[in-house]
A protein has these predicted regions:
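Extended, charged alpha-helical coiled-coil/arm scaffolds that mediate oligomerization and mechanical coupling
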Residues: 1-95
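Conserved C-terminal "switch" segment of AAA+ ATPases
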Residues: 11-18, 54-59, 164, 224-237, ...
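Walker A/P-loop
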Residues: 100-132, 161, 191
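AAA+/P-loop NTPase substrate/partner-engagement loops
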Residues: 122-151, 159, 179, 247
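Conserved alpha-helical scaffold flanking the Walker A/P-loop in AAA+ ATPase domains
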Residues: 147-171, 203-210, 475
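AAA+/SF3 P-loop NTPase mechanochemical coupling elements
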Residues: 163-167, 202-221, 271-273, 414
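Conserved catalytic/switch belt of AAA+ P-loop NTPases
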Residues: 172-211
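Peripheral, non-AAA+ core regions of ATP-driven protein-machinery
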Residues: 319, 340, 346-351, 359-557
């Protein structure tokens, strides 16, 4: 007990916490050392004394050194790096600066978690990581009350006690993977932790005293924005898009290859992968926004080279140079067809663009028109919003049927089947609206859609094209898939400033406001133009339809 009193005197606790601990020590004095209650009280006092109340790391104020660390550890990711340098710059001028709460949102394998470690080194903070994937119990965050047998503080307090300072960098990994059940909602418990206005009085259920978390720098990582809104509101979101081919090649040469050579006991004089081979490796053996799959493929090559050396008579590896034709020998047949989207023009088939948890992707949209009774089939695991997009696209086509030279009453005697492969993958969202509409027009007019054109945009019943999200990821996917032309909503023109100039040079990006502007670009022939050539033979109703189209700013000629 004397030892506990000495530790308490040097702990630097606030008055209220010190008073609480003193009363517990007094209680312990009056108990039998062998009683179960004494063990509980002793455990509580130990936790109170283990938590860092005053001890801090000295935060680095050397901005240039921090910048060098961030640049050397990660390629690209300029938004995050700028935000950290801004924080360090402000810190030099302000005595008490609350730690920022950043949330890095991006696909797997882009370096979110490893970036957290780099930021800790750049700011000279100790690094603590807490995986939130699968956490369902509120007590994991806030701790259990002392009335429970075997109760402990929450993971936040436990990790701080383990690291020994009150201002570490705390990485909350996979914050979007938290669940909830009858034991409470951990996302709601995190509201207090991540709110800079409240977290200086964080109350753990076990400690029962206020603890100041305002010195902690919290960084959260997530694969999607599927995070409860109140929690999202408390964090500063920094989106990390996928890497471009050139960036992947640089990362592989500078970081991944040297790392795998070291892990597999090889030297640079034993294995070299040419730039062209690295590009083919990225194109034909991986399809991802990050570089995790690329690292696995490089590791596979390294293992094969080591095996070859182990089976050789002299047990040493001579220099192995990997050229493009060698990849099949080391990695097997090609897994992906690079440039597959550049296939021939097909009737009723359009390339759309989507955003998934692993970045942007190409989406094939198929529509078949067959004689029947006017039924509509939708297959391909479509979500509610996408099913509504199909209905909206159908109405747009019906309202323009005469102007598009589509058979009168087609909705009563033609069955339309909308299918979006791959069938087992769930799909949702409104951004495939113009793709579905174009595929329907192509199927009903028998005019092929251009295979080298991809499109994204939400459609209204009047045929107006509305803005979508994730434009950068979608354009990166189009670039990866060798698409030549991408049609986007006019409202997304402002987002083009964030797109790398290399992508914009190699892609023709065309903004549109109405579905009618799309037909000249996406179809091999424009049904409006075909109809205009025989305008004199139109009946009054069709003439009126054509005027509607012209009034929306699209000339039929």
């Amino acid at each position: 007990i004397e030892e506990l009193s000495k530790r308490l005197a040097s702990a630097g606790m606030p008055k209220s916490s010190k008073k609480k601990t003193e009363s517990e020590i007094l209680k312990l004095k009056q108990m039998s050392p062998m009683s179960a209650e004494a063990t509980v009280v002793r455990s509580y006092i130990d936790w109170m004394l283990s938590v860092p109340w005053r001890k801090k790391s000295k935060i680095s104020s050397d901005i240039l050194a921090a910048k060098d660390i961030l640049e050397n550890d990660h390629h690209g990711l300029n938004d995050v790096k700028d935000r950290i340098i801004e924080y360090l710059a402000v810190q030099k001028r302000v005595d008490k600066l609350k730690g920022p709460v950043l949330c890095l949102v991006g696909p797997p394998g882009v370096g979110k978690t490893s970036l957290g470690e780099s930021i800790a080194r750049a700011t000279n903070r100790k690094f603590v990581r807490m995986a939130l994937g699968g956490v369902r119990d509120e007590a994991e965050i806030r701790g259990h009350r002392r009335t429970y047998i075997g109760s402990m503080p929450g993971k936040i307090v436990q990790k701080l006690a383990k690291v020994g300072v009150k201002n570490p960098l705390f990485l909350l990994d996979e914050i979007d993977k938290m669940g909830q059940d009858h034991r409470g909602d951990p996302a709601s418990a995190l509201l207090e932790v991540l709110d800079p206005e409240q977290n200086d009085t964080f109350n753990d259920n076990y400690l029962e005293v206020d603890y100041d978390l305002s010195d902690v720098m919290f960084i959260c990582t997530s694969n999607s924005m599927n995070i409860p809104l109140p929690l999202l509101d408390r964090m500063e979101i920094i989106k990390i898009p996928g890497y471009m081919e050139e960036e992947k090649k640089n990362i592989a040469s500078r970081f991944l290859l040297p790392k795998q050579l070291f892990n597999n006991g090889l030297s640079q004089s034993e294995l070299q992968i040419s730039d062209r081979s690295m590009l083919d490796l990225i194109r034909f053996y991986t399809r991802e926004a990050g570089v995790r799959g690329l690292e696995k493929e490089i590791a596979k090559i390294c293992r094969k080279v080591v095996k070859k050396a182990a089976l050789a008579k002299d047990q040493t590896a001579s220099l192995t140079k990997i050229v493009p034709k060698d990849l099949e020998q080391y990695l097997g047949i090609k897994k992906f067809n690079f440039g597959e989207a550049e296939s021939k023009d097909e009737v009723g088939q359009v390339t759309g663009l989507a955003v998934t948890s692993v970045g942007g992707d190409l989406l094939t949209i198929e529509v078949a028109a067959v004689p029947g009774k006017g039924s509509h089939n939708r297959t391909g695991s479509l979500g509610d919003v996408m099913q509504e997009s199909v209905q909206a696209a159908t109405t747009v086509v019906r309202s323009r049927a005469k102007a598009l030279n589509i058979e009168k009453g087609f909705h009563e005697n033609i069955d339309l089947h909308v299918h979006i492969p791959e069938g087992a993958t769930p799909k949702d969202g409104p951004s495939a609206g113009i793709g579905i509409c174009t595929a329907m027009i192509s199927a009903l007019t028998s005019i092929p859609a251009r295979g080298s054109v991809a499109m994204t945009g939400e459609i209204t019943l009047r045929g107006q094209v509305l803005a979508i999200g994730g434009l950068k990821e979608k354009l990166l996917a189009a670039h990866r898939g060798s698409i030549k032309t991408v049609i986007i909503p006019d409202a997304n023109k402002r987002d083009l400033k964030e797109i790398p100039s290399k992508i914009l040079k190699e892609l023709e990006v065309i903004p549109i406001s109405w579905i009618d502007e799309l037909l000249d670009i996406a179809l091999t022939k424009n049904p409006l133009t075909l109809l205009a050539d025989s305008k004199d033979s139109l009946d009054d109703g069709a003439e009126q339809d054509l005027k509607i189209v012209e009034r929306q700013g699209i000339s039929a000629h």
